[in-house]
Swiss-Prot record:
Heterohexamer, formed by a dimer of trimers. The hexameric TusBCD complex contains 2 copies each of TusB, TusC and TusD. The TusBCD complex interacts with TusE. Its EC number is 2.8.1.-. One of its GO terms (biological process) is tRNA wobble position uridine thiolation. InterPro entries: DsrEFH-like, Sulphur_relay_DsrE/F-like, Sulphur_relay_TusD/DsrE. It is an enzyme of class 2 (transferase). GO terms for molecular function: sulfur carrier activity; sulfurtransferase activity. Coiled coil: none annotated. It comes from Sodalis glossinidius (strain morsitans). PANTHER family: PROTEIN YCHN (PTHR34874), SULFURTRANSFERASE TUSD (PTHR34874:SF3). This is Sulfurtransferase TusD. GO terms for cellular component: sulfurtransferase complex. It holds the Pfam family DsrE. Transmembrane segments: none annotated. Part of a sulfur-relay system required for 2-thiolation of 5-methylaminomethyl-2-thiouridine (mnm(5)s(2)U) at tRNA wobble positions. Accepts sulfur from TusA and transfers it in turn to TusE.
Length: 130
């Protein structure tokens, strides 16, 4: 039986295993034929959406890996706007409104509110936090 999943990632792209484990879990569930509708990045998890992240050559580039996963499997990547702005992650619209010189939100990610998280959680069979 195929299930619909929603993930919430609260770990940063680098510094602990939560984001990496979430990505590996997402790949595994998709390989097993399940559906992943939404990944919501919250708290320090918003760092997974920072396109200016530059890992060492021998490290996995989690920001680009999430982007590729989303493109290949039509997964929505939502980033908590309030948490992102507190941590210096912004899109062009917010940068303009806040009079910042540029944006750094990786293409494929979308700033959204907790309402998006609630909608995703209510619409899936399994909700898992990393």
């Amino acid at each position: 039986m195929s299930l619909d999943y929603c993930l919430m990632v609260t770990g940063p792209a680098y510094g602990n295993q939560r984001a990496s484990s979430a990505l590996q879990f997402a790949r595994a569930l998709l390989e097993c034929g399940h559906r992943l509708g939404t990944v919501f990045f919250y708290q320090d998890g918003v760092h997974n959406a920072n396109r200016l992240s530059a890992p060492a050559g021998d490290e996995v580039d989690l920001v680009r890996a999430w982007h590729e996963l989303a493109q290949q499997h039509q997964v929505a990547l939502h980033v908590c706007a309030a948490a992102a702005l507190r941590r210096g992650v912004t899109d062009a619209l917010q940068a303009s409104l806040l009079k910042r010189s540029g944006e750094n939100l990786q293409p494929g990610f979308e700033l959204s509110g907790l309402g998006s998280l609630v909608q995703a959680a209510l619409g899936c069979d399994r909700f898992i936090q990393f």
